[in-house]
Amino acid sequence: IGKAHGGVSVSGGVGERTREGNXLYMEMKESKVINEQNISESKVALVYGQMNEPPGARMRVGLTALTMAEYFRDVNKQDVLLFIDNIFRFVQAGSEVSALLGRMPSAVGYQPTLGTEMGSLQERITSTKEGSITSIQAVYVPADDLTDPAPATTSAHLDATTVLSRGLAAKGIYPAVDPLDSTSTMLQPWIVGEEHYDTAQGVKQTLQRYKELQDIIAILGLDELSEEDRLTVARARKIERFLSQPFFVAEVFTGSPGKYVRLSETIKGFQMILSGELDXLPEQ
């Protein structure tokens, strides 16, 4: 955002751990994104409401970060990346405030004003003729239940959701993104094109069929499947591994150099897997 588009980033740490906030601050200084000698040259603003602070302070941090983003957009006329970590802590802080005010809790103990409070934050994240605000929000999902009121209310406001899977992480596949639970309103043929859309739907259908077959495989084994289903399983496993990608930021931890892959190459690769061109190759 800062280098390619001349924009700025605002990070709102809602209920952030002190050590994590400090580690991010030091990393921003080392990468010269924050310049303490000349603050006007900085490309990042950090706002924290730490875990040990009262719920009122934690609840206002997300709104404070958003107000700063609006300033950069409306006054400085810049494009802004707003990162909120974690939006669930915003809901949690609101629940604590609601309890202190003596309000009757609603479903699963959340505050009765959950939808209104979430809307007061999310509906301000918008673009104008002067600039734009693009928001990336980390969402904690209690007990991995996507129907929990907190993540469900949040996702209703988001254009796209990227769901991380413990199962994929256990297989050592990173990023552990679950393509079946993840969604995007941008995945439409008139936006991404017919080829991209059709390929994505084919990938999802193959993975969905593999998911349906997993119970049968666990009980009876792979040999009991039909030839067609065995082929589907083999292709789905290739797709799972093809969806992984070494990150530049994770080089220190994995020892694997990061790689960029062009979108056109990715689509072509999926088409080759789905068509059976790569059936002769091993999963790895």
From Swiss-Prot:
Location, primary (coarse class): plastid
InterPro entries: ATP-synt_VA_C, ATP_synth_F1_bsu, ATPase_a/bsu_AS, ATPase_alpha/beta_chains, ATPase_F1/V1/A1_a/bsu_nucl-bd, ATPase_F1/V1_b/a_C, P-loop_NTPase
Catalyzed reactions per annotation: ATP + H2O + 4 H(+)(in) = ADP + phosphate + 5 H(+)(out)
Domain of life per record: Eukaryota
Gene3D superfamilies in UniProt: Bovine Mitochondrial F1-atpase, Atp Synthase Beta Chain, Chain D, domain 3, P-loop containing nucleotide triphosphate hydrolases
Keyword Membrane: yes
UniProt keywords, alphabetically: ATP synthesis, ATP-binding, CF(1), Chloroplast, Hydrogen ion transport, Ion transport, Membrane, Nucleotide-binding, Plastid, Thylakoid, Translocase, Transport
One GO MF term attached to the UniProt entry: ATP binding
Record-level GO BP terms: proton motive force-driven mitochondrial ATP synthesis
Example of a GO cellular component annotation carried by this entry: proton-transporting ATP synthase complex
EC numbers, comma separated: 7.1.2.2
Pfam families, sorted: ATP-synt_ab, ATP-synt_VA_C
Family: Belongs to the ATPase alpha/beta chains family.
Function: Produces ATP from ADP in the presence of a proton gradient across the membrane. The catalytic sites are hosted primarily by the beta subunits.
Oligomer and partners: F-type ATPases have 2 components, CF(1) - the catalytic core - and CF(0) - the membrane proton channel. CF(1) has five subunits: alpha(3), beta(3), gamma(1), delta(1), epsilon(1). CF(0) has four main subunits: a(1), b(1), b'(1) and c(9-12).
NCBIfam families: atpD (TIGR01039)
Name of the protein described by the UniProt record: ATP synthase subunit beta, chloroplastic
